[in-house]
Amino acid sequence: LFPYTTLFRSVKSLERARNAGIPAVCVSPKDYESREVFNDALLAKVKEFTPDLIVLAGFLVKIPETMVHEYSNRIINIHPSLIPSFCGVGYYGLHVHEKALERGVKVTGATVHFVNEGMDEGPIIAQKAVAVEDDDTPEILQRRVMEQAEWLLLPQAVDDIANGRICVVDGKVKHNK
């Protein structure tokens, strides 16, 4: 079983996890008087599960540095662009696709990366490009990036890590042969 932690009480995945017998909890910053108290609570909850790998998807909160250090090269994130484009503070969800269309890029995509102290700055595990069409809206582009890149990259990255096919050397991901 893979424990599931979310920031949002109303997400369908929380219900799905519980229905599948997967331990599921909500640790939301809204429930704590400060970010520091939330960070401590999040780390404590994660430690209870003793995870080998932490997978972030739509986790719109910067991971506390204490947690990044505790789980160095064991936290991964999926980002809906080809990092280093359209990433960092303020680039999440639909905003990423709005900015890509405003800029007029012809190709966008998704990136799976290890989480470090920076925002979308960790070693890149995998990327997949997706074409941008002339008549795209942010919503259409977001859907295409999810279907053609994110939903493929993330499970493959988890599988590669779980089976020892990748490692981080000098701040870069290397694929073991």
Question: For the regions a protein language model found, what residue spans apply to each?
Answer:
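Short, small-residue-biased leader/transition segments that mark boundaries at the very start
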Residues: 1-7
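Donor/substrate-binding cores of folate-linked one-carbon enzymes
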Residues: 53, 57-171
